[in-house]
Amino acid sequence: MSNIIIREAIPGDLNALLECEQGIVRYERPFDGTLRDGEIHYYNLAEMIVADHVHVVVAEVDGKIVGSGYARIEKANPYHKHEDYAYLGCMYVEPEMRGKGINSLVLEALKNWCRSKNITELRLEVYTYNEPAIKAYEKAGFKPILTWMRMGLDE
């Protein structure tokens, strides 16, 4: 395999990032019956690419974007020890490229950016039954701290 390049996203990457986002949606639909049918968007990627408080990165192999991720600086709740934290999202690697360390490289780039901004707390969300993602994040050092629960009163 060619070299994997992790770089900051630019506006010209928007279409590829939107494809990554739709890959996430397709993968997550089986975990969440509350998602609307058709094309949906989790993120405003066009804004995020140019925002100062967000760092969007892409993973490239042979000039093709095969993965993505972002870190967005958020204000912490006043009862937390830290004032700010980074929320990670749009974490995606194309299925045929998984298992090659790309997600680890994306995470490392995001962690480095967070350190440069004096952010010491990282958070992300993952579906309870998305065991491959949970294992990957735990391997990277994340620990589960809260379980979200839902109930549909019309189900």
Regions found by a protein language model. Give the residues of each.
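Conserved active-site alpha-helix within GNAT-family acetyltransferase domains
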Residues: 104, 128-146, 151
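A short helix-loop-beta-strand connector motif used in the catalytic cores of GNAT acetyltransferases and
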Residues: 46-58, 87
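Conserved GNAT-fold acetyl-CoA-binding loop/helix
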Residues: 25-45
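Conserved beta-strand in the GNAT
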Residues: 58, 64-73, 87, 92
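A short beta-loop-alpha structural element at the N-terminal edge
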Residues: 5-19, 30
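Conserved GNAT acetyl-CoA-binding A-motif
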Residues: 114-125
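Conserved acetyl-CoA-binding loop-helix of GNAT-fold acetyltransferases
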Residues: 90-93, 99-112, 135, 139
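Conserved acetyl-CoA binding element of GNAT-fold acetyltransferases
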Residues: 82-95, 147-150
